[in-house]
Structure formats: structure tokens, C-alpha cells
Amino acid sequence: MNPRRKSRFKLVIFVVLGIAIASGLMLYALRQNIDLFYTPSEVIQGKDNNPNQKPEVGQRIRVGGMVVEGTVVRDPKSLKVRFDLNDIGPAITVEYEGILPDLFREGQGIVAQGVLTQPTVLTATEVLAKHDENYVPPELGEKMQKVHKPMGIEAADLKGESARDRQEKEGAK
């Protein structure tokens, strides 16, 4: 090999090796940040009822479900909260220390992200409360009522059929 070709060959090897190392480090970093989503039933029974597809203890996961009524236990001396979460099947226990979202309540849908510390216990680092598409924050709802009352708009008008629509229907009859 002549010196020029040898130099190019070394450069190509160096670039390919650099790309391989960078790709490996990126994949490793991404693998650490992947949080798989499960339902409480899937945590206990495995995805598609396959016990081989259960999350492992120590694995970071996200679990979504409904807060079981009567299971919320708050520690009066700290921000620790413990509650059960279920879907249509068995429930898992979620332990969380921090301020819960305003929309958090029993019977409400939530998503908890954290580490599975026991097969049926998730120690959450984050709790997100879900709401339906008709949700209006309380502050905004109050302001809307103040603005719409002087205009002659009622709360029922904001939820579907307006007074004008009702009058048009009655006039068409």
C-alpha cells in the first residue's frame, strides 16, 4: 500500500470506529431513559397475559389506571401518599412523596412513573392526573361564568345546545 492509501485507510477506520462508539453510547443512554407503559393488570399478569412479559423489580415504568376509592392514605407528618391503582383487573400499590396534582382524587385516572420496588408496588417519582376533553380549570370556569352571565348565556349553553338553538327547534315544530 502506498502512503496516501494507508493514510486514507487509517482515516476511514478512525471515522467508522468513532461513529460506532458514539452510536453505542447513544443507545446506552436511550436505554436508560426508556419507561415502558403498563396497566396495573399487565404489571401483575404480564402483557397479553404472558408472565414472561412482566416488568422486573427495579425497572422504571409508567403505569396508568384509576385510583381505587377508599385506598388513599396520606402521612400527616410528610407528603407521603399511598394508594391503589387498577384498571379492570387487579390493583397495584403506588407510593409517592410529593405534592399531588390538583386533579388527583379517588376514582380519577392517573399515570404514575417510577420504579417497581416489589412485584405489585411502584415507588413513583411523578404522578400525572388525567382529565376528559370537557375539563375546564375551576378558575377559568368561574371567569367564564362571570363573563357569560351578563351576555345572557347560561351554563347549559356552554355544554351543548344554546338557547338560540332551542328556540330554532321550537320554531321549526
From Swiss-Prot:
Gene3D superfamilies attached to this UniProt entry? Nucleic acid-binding proteins
Segments on the Cytoplasmic face = 1-8
The way it spans or sits in the membrane comes to: Single-pass type II membrane protein
Which controlled-vocabulary keywords does the entry list?
Answer: Cell inner membrane, Cell membrane, Cytochrome c-type biogenesis, Heme, Iron, Membrane, Metal-binding, Signal-anchor, Transmembrane, Transmembrane helix
- List the Periplasmic topological domains: 30-173
Q: Which GO terms describe its biological process?
A: cytochrome complex assembly
**Superkingdom to which the source organism belongs:** Bacteria
> Which cysteines are disulphide-bonded?
none
HAMAP family xref list = CcmE (MF_01959)
This chain's protein is named Cytochrome c-type biogenesis protein CcmE
Q: Which organism is it from?
A: Haemophilus influenzae (strain ATCC 51907 / DSM 11121 / KW20 / Rd)
